[in-house]
Amino acid sequence: MAATINGEGLTVVEYTAELARYKSAQKALNKDVSDTDAGKAVLEDLIAQILLAQGAKAAGHEISGSALQSRLDALTAQLGGADKLTQWESGHGYTDASFRMDLERSIDAAWMRDKIINAVPATADQVHVQQILLYNANEAQNVLQQLKGGADFNTLAAQYDPNARGDLGWFPKGYLLDPHVEQAAFSLQVGQISDVIQTNVGYDILKVLERDPGHPLSPDAYLAMQEQALRNWISQQRAQANIVLAP
């Protein structure tokens, strides 16, 4: 076994075949991935898939044999017949039995994934923020002093960003790439101005324009929240799971 996850085995044959498929896909994308990185990525993906499939079973999901066969029949027809399916399986490192098992697991995992992401609410606590982004620490401190002296934030924001006037729009927690900016934004009161925040991009000064505990998520933010929910679920399950890796 390459690993066991809560007593369910991940065979070396299955792992090796998936690794070969992964490397082939990366090569087709002209991506150079080391054997070590490829092995880690494949193992993590397989463990996540098994945990999701186990979660589906625990939640009461069960695909019937007839439904699974219908999926196989549809795929067989799509490929052009049973011989074509056998050729495809062979070319991708599958046997009939291993492909059937992998398909069932994939269906279970997809069901659980949909259950997790569909449970994410379409609204969230969000702030509407305006920023002044600068690339020099001294200039940032100078602008902050102007603001403290009564200068208009919107006027200064327009000076440094004539098009968008520094408007970041609405966003929830967990959406921004920089946690320092997000933490500062959610710690401010409406109308309050932050100190200078150093980021990987430069130096930010923020002003919270509005806050709404139930503001509708934008499509991008909703997708990000769904992805975060899925990552969190897998991380929690992984922490609680009994996972034994082969030496």
Predicted regions and their residues:
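Short, low-complexity, Pro/Ser/Thr/Gly-rich segments in the mature regions of secreted, periplasmic
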Residues: 232-247
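Extended amphipathic alpha-helical interaction segments
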Residues: 110, 114, 118-146, 155, ...
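Proteostasis/folding factors centered on peptidyl-prolyl cis-trans isomerases
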Residues: 90-131, 158-160, 179-219
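N-terminal targeting/tethering segments
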Residues: 1-97
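Surface-exposed patches in mature extracellular/periplasmic domains of secreted proteins
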Residues: 31-32, 58-65, 155-159, 194-197, ...
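Extracytoplasmic
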Residues: 2-5, 10, 37, 63, ...
